[in-house]
């Protein structure tokens, strides 16, 4: 689904329960000057024709590969702490966020962070998730799931700012990622949380 930034509420504002079903909300900014020039260059000559890049079978195979990306127990616990911090920020030394967040992230955010972090790790050519993967994708997964208080909205506080604060305050694990430890832990802790829309 797309949302026009000029009409930020969209045609029909979605309630929280429906927004929660979207895995990601990705904000696409205006293109930079060189990017806009490239758009102009491409479209001024002849409209590009779409060509197939991946087959359906390849896409399914990539989805299967992403679901097999290893999530260490420490990384999974880190994901849970990030989500819990949106519900009870006072428990994570952020009492000032208590009046800011009206509704925190649901368990779908936890599942979404695992799924999106796995996909990002795969894009980076890894078969395991790092805390940096979680941090890189956290705002896209969590920001649209947080409902701010009226006072926070009046103060122009954005959900992304809240996520940035949580990422700064909730410490990531210090990992040791050698293959033997991954394989040993992989046998003990397997996270097969699929993201169900």
What label would you give each PLM region?
Residues 39-40, 79, 137-142:
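Short alpha-helical scaffolding segments that buttress acidic/His motifs in well-ordered protein cores
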């Amino acid at each position: 689904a797309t949302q026009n930034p000029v009409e930020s509420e969209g045609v029909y504002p979605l309630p929280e329960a429906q927004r929660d079903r979207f895995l990601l909300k990705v904000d696409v900014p205006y293109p930079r000057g060189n990017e806009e020039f490239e758009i102009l260059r491409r479209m001024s000559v002849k409209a590009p024709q779409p060509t197939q890049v991946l087959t359906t079978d390849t896409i399914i195979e990539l989805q299967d590969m992403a679901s097999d990306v290893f999530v260490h127990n420490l990384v999974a616990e880190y994901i849970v702490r990030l989500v819990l911090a949106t519900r009870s920020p006072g428990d994570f030394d952020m009492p000032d966020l208590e009046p800011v967040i009206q509704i925190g992230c649901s368990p779908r955010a936890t599942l979404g962070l695992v799924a999106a972090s796995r996909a990002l790790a795969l894009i980076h050519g890894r078969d395991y998730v790092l805390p940096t993967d979680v941090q890189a994708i956290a705002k896209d997964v969590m920001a649209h799931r947080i409902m701010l208080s009226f006072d926070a909205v009046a103060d122009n506080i954005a959900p992304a700012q809240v996520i940035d604060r949580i990422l700064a305050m909730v410490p990531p694990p210090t990992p040791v990622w050698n293959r033997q430890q991954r394989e040993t832990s992989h046998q003990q802790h397997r996270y097969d949380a699929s993201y169900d829309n």
